[in-house]
Amino acid sequence: MAKHAPIFPNVQGFLHGGDYNPDQWLAYPDVLEQDVQLMREAKWNVVSLGIFSWVSLEPEEGLFTFEWLDEAIERLTHAGVRILLATPSGARPAWLSAKYPEVLRVGPDGRRNRHGGRHNHCYTSPIYREKVRIINRKLAERYAHHPGVIGWHVSNEYGGECHCPLCQEAFREWLKRKYKTLDALNHAWWTPFWSHTYTDWSQIESPMPHGETSIHGLNLDWKRFVTDQTVDFCRHEIEPLKQVNPNLPVTTNFMGTYPGLNYWRFRDVLDVISWDSYPRWHAHETLVPEAVHTAMVHDLNRSILKKPFLLMESTPSVTNWQAVSKQKRPGVHVLVSLQAVAHGADSVQYFQWRKSRGSYEKFHGAVVDHVGHANTRVFRDVQAVGEMLERLAPMAGAEVKADAAVIFDWENRWALEDAKGPRNIGMHYEETVVNHYAALWRMGVPMDVIDEEQPLDGYKLVVAPMLYMVRPGVAERMKAFVERGGSLVLTYWSGIVDENDLVFLGGFPGPLRELAGVWAEEIDALYDGERVPVRVADGNPLGLAGHYEARELCEVVHLEGAEPIAVYGADYYEGMPAATVHRVGKGKVYYVAARLEDAFLRDFFARVAAEAGVARAIERELPDGVSAMVRSGDGVEYVMLMNFTPEAREVALDEAEYKPLYGEAPTDGAVRLPAYGVSVLERPARNG
């Protein structure tokens, strides 16, 4: 398997750097000179430059002052530091708000915002779009062919929504294109409920707390519109950049699993995916809960374009906006940086280079503290990451080959979380996906994280927790996948509604019923603290043994061709299936009918993955809290072992021939990882 081409032409190895804001320090020329030398010491080779610099670039309408940016780019380029040049739309100048108040966002309460904050602008506003086009064009004409500029960092952390008259009209036009007629819209939204039928397009407004929120189809389409409008704004930003230099890659930085935007919709406008990672490290006894969730989001971002991504932001130490600003313990910064690389990142980048003297983020972590020199623990941690990335440079571009995929779907999440019932104190969609992902993560199984519309070719195992919404074509793709020999895991509360959030008629799980071989008659919601015992079925096909517990949600299902794996041990559904398997063609469909404890998921997925022939990073059991990942390319595989606990762990290796590259080396067929320790090993590719 060949490696991917470099993300940025003529840039080999990993990128190491982060946000750099020289415009905050123009009155301190000695600081700007020190920055370059300190970057060399920190082993930085890239900066994101100019992210919030609009007023420094255009202090008055039509007056452009690029001289400070010219100097910064020349100084960085001379030092060998490459530049991801930002477009500054994330925070507009006060003169723009004052002269053109229509660019200011209107909140869901119907009130127009004042100037302030950031991303407080309307994506629909023609004036704002024109002003963004002008500044982006100016930047492109001046810098798009500069040898030090390797790509565009478009805006920053898109998010939010606007309810102004311009957006209301744009939403209505979006709906007209989608539904063509009001009759079609009224049927799709089921508006006769509570006499909410629309008789004129002008009656439709965005969901607002003091207005309409009870039509779930409206709520769902509004979220789709907000995503489409944001993607269109992003495309509008990119156009003048690509007109000047079509070969310069573009990206924008995502925010984890931010609920406001469906990030899959950006895949057609971006050349590379990047995201900002800020877990609450040390919030639990071990780092494992945060490590699992972070790993899943890394995999999601890699899966969007199926190639390496950029870790655009992380903190070398702390944030200042979380409830507790907990410092990373010694060794943790290298550990979590390697985790990003292990899951497919070709960069480790930070916010921010130097701590600001004032305003909102003056206490946010940075490489250079207010003390202003390199003699700090955090600076040394950053140096250590730079040294690691230099040693691992041949790994850049290597593939993460996944036999398994877990479905995390934004539209499914929107609909599921908007539904009233069966458990309004928490359906926990994202947590449920993470729990299923975690069972495979603990086994060292590389995974893609995809939405429900992605092709399933090439996978051996697909896990689809709580697939409440099943859009057209999804059931058919799943059936074809299973018939070819794939293993599919479905759960309770799946196949409930269609793409319009209309309930399927004829029995659940709707279009997945025949495939699953079960009929879900009803679902029982439990109060917090309630538990229902579950026991394995005698002679069950997976060979499971023992007893487990279910919590929160228990479906009452009837077998329609499936075989029981486990059954309920109490309540009115005692003896009925709690987990099943249905053989379809050459494959199998598993249906987990209750929210079962982690112990069940571990035992269940260990057997399901083995039967499906899913490859693991190493073919050995991993100690608790240790993660194993593998990247491959050009005939070799890079295995990364990471200990997310504060105690030492010993990892037994399989029979492959391992060569140490970084961290702990193998001894007598095992690697001993200290607390928060890592090991990177090279072995010949399993398949040549």
UniProtKB/Swiss-Prot annotation:
Belongs to the glycosyl hydrolase 42 family. Zn(2+) binds at residues 122, 162, 164, 167. One of its GO terms (molecular function) is beta-galactosidase activity. Substrate binds at residues 118, 156, 321, 361-364. Its EC number is 3.2.1.23. It is an enzyme of class 3 (hydrolase). Ca(2+), Mg(2+) and EDTA have little effect on enzyme activity at 1-10 mM. Zn(2+) at 3, 5, 7 or 10 mM inhibits activity by 20%, 30%, 40% and 65%, respectively. Has potential use in hydrolyzing lactose in neutral pH dairy products such as whole milk or whey. Also could be used in milk lactose hydrolysis during pasteurization at high temperatures. The active site is at residues 157, 313. Keywords: Glycosidase, Hydrolase, Metal-binding, Zinc. Hydrolyzes o-nitrophenyl-beta-D-galactopyranoside (ONPG) and p-nitrophenyl-beta-D-fucopyranoside (PNPF), but not p-nitrophenyl-beta-D-glucopyranoside (PNPG), p-nitrophenyl-beta-D-xylopyranoside (PNPX) or p-nitrophenyl-beta-D-arabinopyranoside (PNPA). Also hydrolyzes lactose, including lactose in milk. GO terms for cellular component: beta-galactosidase complex. This is Beta-galactosidase BglY. Optimum pH is 5.8. Approximately 80% of activity retained after incubating the enzyme for 40 minutes in buffers ranging from pH 5.0 to pH 10.5.
